[in-house]
Amino acid sequence: MLIESMGLACFARPLQWFKSQWLWLLLSIAAFCLLMRVQVEWLWFGQFDWQGMLLRRWLWQLGGLLLALLVVATCQLWQRNWIKLEVASNLGESSLSLHGWRYGLGLLGCFVVVVGDLVLLSRLAWLACFKPFDLGHWWSEPFEDIWALVIPLSCVFISICVMLGNARGGRIAHLIGCFCFSISIARGWGLWALALAIPPTGIKEPLLGGDVSFGLGQFPALAFALVVLLAQLILTTCTTIWMKLAQPESLSDWVFKGLSPRQCNFLRPLIGIILLTLSALLWLSRHELLWTQNGTVAGAGWLDAHLILPLRSLASLAILVFAFLVIPFTWIQQRRLLRLIASIIGVGAILLEVLLAPFVQWMVVKPRELKLETPYIIRAIKATRKAFQLDSITTTLINPQPQLTQLDLEQGASTLRNIRLWDSQPLLATNRQLQQLRVYYRFSNAAVDRYRFVPDVANRQQVMITARELDQAALPKRSRTWLNRHFVFTHGYGFTLSPVNTRAPDGLPDYFISDLGTSTRLEGSSELGITREDVKEAVPIGRAALYFGMLPSPYALAPSKLKELDYPVGDKNIYNHYLGSGGVPVGQPWQQLAAAMYLFEPRLLNTGSLTINSKLLIRREVRQRVRAIAPFLEVIGDPYLVSTSVSSKDLNYEAKQNQYWIVEAYTSSRTYPYAANLPDGRPLRYLRNSVKAIVDAYSGRVHLYVSEPRDPIILGWQRLFPDLFKPLEEMPSSLREHLKVPTDLFNVQVQQLLRYHVTDPRIFYSGDDVWQVPKELYGRRQVPVDPYHITAQLGTQESSEFLLLQPLTPLARPNLSAWLAARSDGEHYGKLVLLRFPSQTPIFGPEQIQALINQDPQISQQFGLWDRAGSEVVQGNLLVVPLGKALLYVEPVYLRARQGGLPTLTRVVVSDGKRIAMAEDLGEGLRALVDGSSNKAVYLNRNDLPPIKAADQLN
């Protein structure tokens, strides 16, 4: 209009052509950028030969997008026909007219619904973009940013309506909602895929009779689909009505003349579909009763089964009937009366659930709660134990002798040989001062593991291994140039390996492997009967560069014309080039362009340092690497490094490589029927350590092995991506020997066991037999006793094995009730054993023993002398260890200077619950404990061990 009024109509068509050309240019640039990113992702997955899996993921997303676009196109078509119908029937008889405050209330209501819908859809789209595998439980995701969404969207909607015209504002709001809807459906591919692929478990939940797999797979997908569809349909309806309500003549007169009969009839099918969707959502919400917790019972209780479930079923059926009555079928008579009846029943059922349920709970359930809830408590106990594998625990009753004897020492000789005296924190503190060697190296954690140094000895030596990684954040500021960060400082190097049960003469850790590069030192231990050759044979070092690790690392480009820092030797640095097979090729100009656009890094195009063999190394943090390959798995906890040789028969492993990261991956669910949340409030009702990921520390190659083949969730993903996973039996045996039950899974099982070790519903209801994790004094702080690894015997007739152990005490009492032990060796991997102590005989727990230690006159006097001399006494983790037919309590004592000194292992305190002894080493302490420093043997050395029968060897 402005162009025509100025007499410039001749320029209108060229201007329109110019705008369309710019639009096509922008679309072409966007498509080209997308193509470059797709190419890099394709090549990245190509290094693992998993392009087929990536293609299937893209096809699932494309299918979801096409389905969403079909819904969006239908909504747009309906809206366009509505607008045409509005113009055509403008002179017809109208109804539903609004005047004055009623008109204002209608405008306000429509506005609130539109903004609320946009908030919900934009929230779901945000989750779909950044946390797509959390969409199945989007309702439990925190909504801290709700006002950050409401206020901007309200302002945007108002601005659109004011600046662009009210009708156009409604259209744009609808387009925004359609965009968010499409993103949510496309990015939610994991929900639809798993829902279609998850197999039935054969376990039926007792309330509705559905298979447990429905809650694990189908329910999250159906709930999300119905919610997002309902939001889209309501948005379409409200924006369409807004365009009618907010006409200029209506706003000026504050009067809405109403809708014509044809418009009302055209609106009814859409309202009917909305009601059908709402009915389906209400029907589905009956299943939600199975994983809600109100009061005593996890899952549906008596009130849910006898009141809420029937009311929801009734409300759903009433709304379903109402939906059919809204749709203008000619064969339905007395439509208005039937609609009134259906609406009264539906609304009444919903109101009764809200208003009547608290009264029935107070008046009917509470007075007879135990009797009414007993069947449901039994269901909750069984389901929770099943969901967290507590039902497979083997329970053993033990009654330890009150006093340690020489016979116990002889029977527990293999246990004594691996008593852990070094905690991870003192060892890390020492390593960081003695073994980091340069400011840019970092030891992130110390992992407990075991290695077989002597082939003819059944038990393996327990060790702590710490990887020496490169921490670019620690580089001096002058060294943080772009070339240094991405071309020179590309990797860490080597690791340290220490026995957990010995110390050097100065109190510092012993090392089997220390230092790095050509200065790497391999040492044996005469105390343990391990030679240098044993270490060299059992722990090959080989190519020790760590390009992939625990620490977040930026992308690296290697090999290049610039040499990479390999390791320092004295005042000099040794340089090398990356020779691994992993990485995205960037040797060609078009590959460099793709990498530059992928990384938003134009400097790649003119660096001049790349060669024809150069590769781009991205996702170098091993957990991020596993998540990128299998985003449907949860990667929890710290990975740990293993150094071992893999047989040449395993073609998928590089022959010269010895360092591998083991990463624990999980499947989980919040919708396992009748299972309880964690005691700490986390909404987790099912957990399996379903996958063990092996990541090559040099080349970054990833292998995924299924460790829980009966888990229905991982079985579903195996159906979808059969080439991605291998059975655990195909893992090289040298790596399988280093698998261990992850501490994170074990902690979750311990939390649930605190209450769900009880299977009697009466005792469970009364809460008389609840356990707790005991506390101990570590340094100067009282902390919960963390699970600890020991190599011990579960019975006097069994060989020692690698165990993860957690002592447990009764709630509010310090006596020891039980141990939960997780087995990690051979065919026993993953099995849980509960060692229960007699309730009538008090067994001292860690807190009581620690109190006795601190009350001992000689020990407290010695601690005071050290304290006055300027040293800080750190009492380490108190271990409670089964030994023969008795218990042994062991606590290491460290000394360090108050101002950041090195922790040194100075003393070892031992006790059997009656007597306490402190000595310079474990052997002396045990001799003093048993019979006052006698010369009888204490078996701490392999060479001192009595012969081991072949039948006692570990598998």
Swiss-Prot record:
Organism: Prochlorococcus marinus (strain MIT 9313)
PANTHER family per UniProt: UPF0182 PROTEIN SLL1060
GO annotations of cellular component type: extracellular region; plasma membrane
Keyword Metal-binding: no
Protein name per its UniProtKB record: UPF0182 protein PMT_0755
Keywords in alphabetical order: Cell membrane, Membrane, Transmembrane, Transmembrane helix
Transmembrane segments: 25-45, 58-78, 107-127, 146-166, 178-198, 214-234, 264-284, 313-333, 340-360
Similarity section: Belongs to the UPF0182 family.
Keyword Aminoacyl-tRNA synthetase recorded: no
Subcellular location: Cell membrane
Membrane topology: Multi-pass membrane protein
